[in-house]
């Protein structure tokens, strides 16, 4: 399922969302800024999320993490490569031969595969809060964040309980000094729950991340212009990952954003919006 925000004559920008995120998670102020700058944002629900195709296996969150750390093979219904192929099929369906791509978190991992495998299809790549290696104790989420992510796998929670745990998570992984527990945010979470009630897709997407392993060799072959945006206090994907990506991608620029966690709150977006548009403008 996708949403083409237009305008029709704008330069297409494919937006690839992260783990457990629906297309509605892209901030409206970011969408508007892209449109106002002459771009045509196109967002979509990754498989197993939102209104896109669902799979049926029921892996457990903790068992997959334990298997990964113990180097035990992880069974997943699909890999990140399959999710990248979904994006290519969407571009083909929309008759888009070439576009920009912006990937957030897991969406950045998917986008790395996209631009490495299909460099002729993309003007530029923007990586936000993502990584090249598979998450591990040295570069991945803190134990506290893992516990909060694990809560999402709990079944039979009420709608209000799910909203409360979303507030706990974003308050932990977002920028400091920002009130995430607002009526507006709680309403947005409630609408997302109503749009897509199944949380098992989140666990299957996590299995795809852990089962794909790292992409060091593939990412080192990326040649298209790349902008790497990362928060200096990101507790989910540690800042060191941004420097690693920058080192591997020869044609890349690195922008570390002060007091940015793993979210794009409006004050955070205001800190990098000019650099983002400049990156897109000079690589059309």
Model-inferred region functions:
Residues 1-70:
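Conserved HGGG/HGGXW glycine-rich cap/lid loop of the alpha/beta-hydrolase fold
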Residues 81-99:
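Conserved acidic catalytic loop of the alpha/beta-hydrolase fold
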Residues 97-137:
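Conserved hydrolase catalytic core segment
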Residues 141-217, 224:
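Alpha/beta-hydrolase
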Residues 222, 228-230:
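Short beta-strand/loop motif that positions the catalytic acidic residue
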Residues 224, 238-245:
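Short alpha-helix in the alpha/beta-hydrolase fold that links the catalytic acid
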Residues 233-237:
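Acidic catalytic loop of the alpha/beta-hydrolase fold
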Residues 252-284:
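Catalytic active-site module of serine/aspartate enzymes centered on a nucleophile-bearing elbow/loop
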């Amino acid at each position: 399922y996708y949403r083409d925000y237009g305008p029709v004559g704008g330069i297409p920008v494919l937006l690839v969302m992260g783990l457990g995120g629906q297309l509605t998670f892209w901030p409206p102020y970011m969408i508007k800024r892209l449109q106002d700058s002459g771009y045509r944002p196109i967002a979509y629900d990754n498989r197993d999320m939102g209104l896109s195709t669902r799979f049926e296996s029921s892996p457990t969150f903790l068992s997959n993490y334990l298997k990964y750390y113990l180097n035990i093979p992880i069974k997943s219904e699909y890999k990140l490569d399959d999710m990248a192929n979904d994006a290519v099929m969407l571009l083909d369906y929309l008759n888009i031969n070439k576009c920009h791509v912006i990937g957030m978190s897991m969406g950045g991992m998917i986008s790395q595969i996209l631009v490495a495998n299909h460099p002729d299809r993309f003007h530029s790549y923007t990586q936000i809060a993502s990584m090249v290696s598979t998450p591990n104790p040295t570069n991945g989420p803190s134990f506290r964040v893992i516990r909060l992510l694990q809560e999402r796998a709990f079944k039979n929670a009420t709608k209000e309980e799910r909203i409360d745990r979303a507030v706990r998570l974003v308050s932990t992984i977002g920028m400091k000094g920002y009130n995430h527990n607002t009526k507006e945010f709680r309403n947005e979470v409630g609408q997302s729950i109503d749009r897509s009630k199944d949380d098992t897709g989140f666990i299957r997407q996590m299995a795809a991340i852990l089962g794909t392993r790292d992409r060091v060799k593939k990412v080192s072959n990326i040649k298209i212009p790349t902008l790497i945006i990362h928060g200096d206090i990101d507790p989910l994907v540690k800042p060191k990952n941004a420097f690693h990506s920058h080192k591997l991608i020869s044609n890349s620029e690195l922008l570390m954003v002060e007091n940015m966690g793993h979210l794009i709150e409006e004050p955070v977006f205001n800190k990098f919006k000019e650099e983002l548009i400049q990156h897109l403008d000079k690589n059309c």
